[in-house]
Amino acid sequence: MNLENYKLNTSQVHNNGGTLYKHKNVLYKLYDEFPYFIDEKERNIRLLKNLKLYHIPKIVKIIKKGREFNGYVMEYISNSLTFRQAMYEKISKEKKISAIKDVYITLKQLHSFDICIGDIHMDNFLYVDGNGYTIDLDEIRLKGDEFKFRECYLLKENKNSMISKVATPITDNIKLAIVCLSFYYGVDLETIAVNESLTEVKEKLKEFISNPEEIKKISRVLDMNNLNYLDDVLFLEKEKVLKK
């Protein structure tokens, strides 16, 4: 099979050095050249395959080129939009909350294994009919990773990251919170976080959230010194209100 016939146009999407090909109901992700940390990428994909996380595309198999790891095959999530694409779509609050809870389930699962995502932005989360999916996890960080491996991705993230620090559960949560708040309220808070600061994100939120208690809760989530997951602090309460 000639995969070039199925190559996707992903020039605007972060793919961590890989190229995507869609054939039938699966995606092939192949690395254009062997990255410096190819062993870590292989380890990460094998780990994700074995962990059987909720709300991520199922990893079907590993691809080798000779003896070297060259990519993997995963489930294709059809009819999906990235959170960036879905941000301005007419989607009910109930369905948005449902999708946000899904991506937080995945984040909490990873954190329970001492794994951080690090590479968090609106293009790495998919929405489809009330469901949320986390994608592009081949650069997850394990607690025992060597400093050079972590530093490599810190250098990459300095360019377009909301928080220029080595990934921790707190930075993961804050980044994902900004992604989800952008998606929920239909306001691009991510770009403000990247180009300005978390303080400016909070100021922007005050422009369209009149409830001071809600602002207070979000400020707790965006605290760099404490871990307060967004879905626990804000969206569990919102879900109760919407169900009344």
Predicted regions and their residues:
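C-lobe/activation-segment region of protein kinase-like
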Residues: 139-220
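ATP-binding glycine-rich loop module of kinase domains
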Residues: 7-62, 86
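Terminal C-lobe "cap" of eukaryotic-type protein kinase domains
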Residues: 223-244
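Conserved alphaE helix
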Residues: 95-109
